[in-house]
From Swiss-Prot:
InterPro entries documented for this protein: Ribosomal_uL1, Ribosomal_uL1-like, Ribosomal_uL1/biogenesis, Ribosomal_uL1_3-a/b-sand, Ribosomal_uL1_arc, Ribosomal_uL1_CS
Protein name: Large ribosomal subunit protein uL1
Entry function: Binds directly to 23S rRNA. Probably involved in E site tRNA release. Protein L1 is also a translational repressor protein, it controls the translation of its operon by binding to its mRNA.
Oligomer and partners: Part of the 50S ribosomal subunit.
Protein family (similarity comment): Belongs to the universal ribosomal protein uL1 family.
GO terms under biological process: regulation of translation; translation
Keywords from the named record: Repressor, Ribonucleoprotein, Ribosomal protein, RNA-binding, rRNA-binding, Translation regulation, tRNA-binding
Domain of life of the native organism: Archaea
Keyword Repressor: yes
One GO MF term: structural constituent of ribosome
Source organism per UniProt: Methanocella arvoryzae (strain DSM 22066 / NBRC 105507 / MRE50)
Length: 213
């Protein structure tokens, strides 16, 4: 169950949003402090499962063949690419960039990771979308299911960064549960935990920011 303070902040953000003809996303602005972000080890780069989901489709692509590819399709992967497609994507950078923008998470059988790094690393790497490796005998269905409820939060070298954590069609309680899950992970990840968090705000796409903590 979400904290009361988080639920109230979400309610305020939703109530103060301007009326639009489209469903707005709900975003989180995270401000850190007392961290040297020039050191890669201090940067935030986390995949976080949202207990309430994102409220919209999270797309997953899988590089696999044979039974793994079949299971990936059954599990709801949005794209399943055979290994020979890696070379084709690497040779067609506009297509690769479009795919990287559209897909939230990539998965690849471990045997194909070196080729993906060589052919697609310059496209996927900077976007934080290098595939999660799938070892032999691993359950691709479980991984896809998990990623379909996850988001990636990345600070890069900045103390302030943003993440989409829901949509306005979700209940305040659902959005608040997602926020609290992110805060909990941040407090675990950061060297000094809560002391490294300066402030966190929630807002809709076009609405004003409301302080969560």
């Amino acid at each position: 169950m979400a904290r009361k303070e988080t639920v109230e902040a979400v309610k305020k953000a939703l109530a103060s949003r301007p009326k639009r003809n489209f469903s707005e996303s709900v975003d989180l602005a995270i401000n850190l402090k007392n961290i040297d972000m020039s050191q890669p080890k201090n940067r935030v780069d986390e995949d976080i499962i949202l207990p309430s989901g994102l409220g919209k489709t999270i797309k997953v692509a899988v590089f696999a063949k044979g039974e793994v590819a079949v299971n990936a399709e059954k599990a709801g992967a949005d794209y399943v690419f055979p290994p020979e497609e890696i070379e084709k994507l690497g040779a067609d950078k506009p297509r690769a960039k479009k795919l990287a923008s559209e897909v939230n998470f990539f998965i690849a059988e471990t045997a194909y990771m070196p080729t993906i790094g060589k052919r697609l690393g310059t496209v996927l790497g900077p976007r934080g979308k290098m595939p999660a490796p799938l070892p032999p005998q691993a359950d691709v269905t479980a991984l896809i299911t998990r990623q379909k409820k996850s988001i990636k939060i990345r600070s890069k070298d900045r103390l302030t960064f943003h993440a989409t954590i829901g949509t306005e069609t979700m209940t305040p309680e659902e959005i608040a549960e997602n926020i609290d899950a992110i805060i909990k992970r941040l407090e675990t990840k950061l060297e000094k935990g809560k002391q490294n968090i300066h402030a966190i705000y929630v807002k809709t796409t076009m609405g004003p920011a409301v302080k969560v903590m």
